[in-house]
Amino acid sequence: MNKLPKGWNFTIVDDNADSTNSENIQGKRPRRSRTSVQRSDGASPIIRDNIVLIRTDDNEEFKVGDTIEITQGKGPEDPTTEYGLITEIKFGNSEFIEVIVDWFIRSSEIVGMPNDFFADNELLLTPFRSEVKFIDFIRPINVLSESQFADVVIDESNSHSTFLVKRATDNEGNFSDIFDYKDFSGKVLENPKKCAIQVKELISTTVQKELLKEFSKEQRKKKANKVSTTGRVTRFNKRKESVSTKAIKPENKQVKIEIDNDVLSDQSEEKQEESDYNEAEDANSALESDEENISQESEDSEVEYSTKKKLKNKKLSRRSKAAATPSPKRKLQKKDIEDIYSVVTPTKRMKLGKDDRDSLPVFLSPTKSVPSEFTDPKSVAFKEVKQRLHTSQKLNALPGREDEFAMIYMNHESAVNEKTGCCVYVCGLPGMGKTATIKDVVEQMTYSSERGEMEQFSYLELNGLKLLSPTVAYEALWHHISGDKVSASNAALLLEEYFKREDHKRKPLVILMDEFDQIATKKQNVMYNFFNWPTYSTSKLIVIAVANTMDLPERMLTNKIASRLGLRRIQFRGYTFQQLGDIITHRLEMITKNNRRKVVITSDAIGFASRKVASVSGDARRALTICRRAVEIAEKEYLENKKGEDDSEPYQVLISHISTAINETVNSPLSKYIASLPFASKLVLASLLRRSRRTGLAENSLGDIIDEMRNSFAMATHSEEQGSDELNMQDVLYSDKTFTATNETVPILNLRIHFFKQIVTSLVEAGIIIQQNSPGETSRLVKLDVPEEEVVSVFKKDNAISQFL
């Protein structure tokens, strides 16, 4: 029916006429009235519907451009009260009149920001818009700019109806610069449908400015060197070319365009400068021969660090010095670097690699957003829920790790302020939040140092799984300190000399060594050096070692290394089901309110998933993966039954969806394959697991596994006397009694089970284990290539093999 709800009328306003024609329409649908609004910039006029909604109870009018208070609850005191800007009122298809609102967000709903960042009664614009029901309108509100708000006195009479707007934000935590809301609202009235686009432009412009500042810190210096080099080289050939640096310093109004041009023009500038440099070399070969000791060549050239470099010729011309290729960025003074190099290699040449440009930001063109008319609101909500439940999602806080956060923060804050070295060992099973907590601590320490609350420091992260070899850690650390790339052997000597030298200006260095058990070598010299350097009084080195087991220092490391590691050990225990529930709930609270009404994960479903995971491992990643998979299953059901669902009601993710997701993880193809293996293959895997736990090493030789199988089998089976015609499992696997007829009462047992080579080959081909390719069979190293939890969970359900674990 084309009728408005009871208590509501509407009026069509004609802007061209200076009068308002009001009609009480409850029957026949009127013709649409559209007016042309001339834009201030002289562009073509924009056509929009001028519909004014009237609430007959209090004769309150609502039109495009009004800021309103809206709720889906009982009234203004309801916690679901929100604020929005009406950007579109039109005749619709599903509803007689449809209203589109762009949303504000309260400053109190944003966590993780300083208390003095927001003003009282401040709202923030968001780029989110949705359709609402006008019967939920409460009242209009006053939204003022910063200058207007300063002239208003806020008291109890207007504290719920007068607000300040000077910033915009999005769901990624980005904020815009302070703007004048009065000017912004005037632009919105010209074309209200593009309000969300204008808000996105405000935020993106601010983000690009921040990236431009970081980009310009290094890029402008490099370009300045290139410009001076080009100008000086061309003087040799008497060429006068003006080099413009305007592209390096873009105006505020042209930030987006000039960034792209700046990046794209780098290669052409470099090529032009190289050609000018080659011409200068031909004309000034005599000068180059005099300056051979101070010029730095390209990537394959050699730089001589010797004591002779201190005796430089002061009369060398500036032209030839500038003609050299700009050297990579160094974090230390050039003289200090030369002193260290001269001590390590006083008469040798060392090759320095060219500094890479991986750290430079990449400017990508933004993707075009799909119009809201072609997207399903619930599909968008499902997408955001899955995004928030992803393990890589950045969080404002880490629930359940407050105590561990405080312990790590206190240790490192005291070490940085006192400028002393120390080692901290952090252990816990995978998925316990070790790395995330440490990164959160470093981020908070960085914020405190920027505000002057603690000393400045530098930070480096090393992951043992990402290093090609353990000695690469030396190269990465020296490159972080000096900017030079040298070999591992030279880097170790340079680092030893660097940390021994006393330098009062040196900042403390914090190193996170994640998966540090992967850098263990036979001599363990890499671990020894990294734990020995913090003991120097002049090092100012703080090492955070992260591994998975508590007793790893005693089991793997020698006494001299374990003693240097110290007694500062922080253990991350498994999450309880309450903590897992808090983690999932915290992520769901980050979803925008509009999408939060479309898709809901019930509290029973969250509790069921939390208890299931907490009873097994307490792994937060596993709990999030199960919930994310449950949302995917619920989304599939929604798309299949989309026609029969009521879009006004939220779609619920139930316990049944969680149970289906858990069954998929338990009954994975890998688990089914391991469960279907014969007993002999399971015995090989069980012996490999048992040997790995005994030695603490992931790789073990086949000879050790054969001995482990034989010993564990002898301990698990009984030794009662049996008749000559009876067979037991040991006879089947180890003796020839099964395949040959013998009269011996006690059969001779083989050293290995039958078809052992074929069993190992089949496991390798299936991808269950990895075997080293070496001539000696018993000395070949074997390693499990699948998650250990998968194998253990399957074997625990098998009564025949569980006793061998």
From Swiss-Prot:
Task: Provide the coiled-coil residue spans.
Answer: none
Picking any one GO molecular function of the record gives: metal ion binding
Question: Which InterPro entries does this chain map to?
Answer: AAA_lid_10, ATPase_AAA_core, BAH_dom, BAH_sf, ORC1/CDC6, ORC1_wHTH, P-loop_NTPase
The residues listed in the UniProt record as binding Mg(2+), with positions renumbered to this chain, are 514-515
Q: Where is the composition biased (Basic residues)?
A: 308-321
> What does UniProt give as the signal peptide span?
none
Query: Which positions bind ATP?
Result: 428-436, 515, 548, 621
Major location, coarse class?
nucleus
Mind telling me which SMART domains this protein's record contains? BAH
**Record-level GO BP terms:** DNA replication initiation; mitotic DNA replication checkpoint signaling
Q: Where is this region: Disordered?
A: 1-41, 223-334
What keywords are annotated for this sequence in UniProt? ATP-binding, DNA replication, DNA-binding, Magnesium, Metal-binding, Nucleotide-binding, Nucleus
In terms of Pfam families, this protein maps to: AAA, AAA_lid_10, ORC1_wHTH
GO cellular component terms given for this protein: nuclear origin of replication recognition complex
What subcellular locations does the record give?
Nucleus
Report quaternary structure and partners: ORC is composed of six subunits.
Q: Kindly provide the name given to this protein in its UniProt entry.
A: Origin recognition complex subunit 1
Q: Which gene encodes it?
A: ORC1
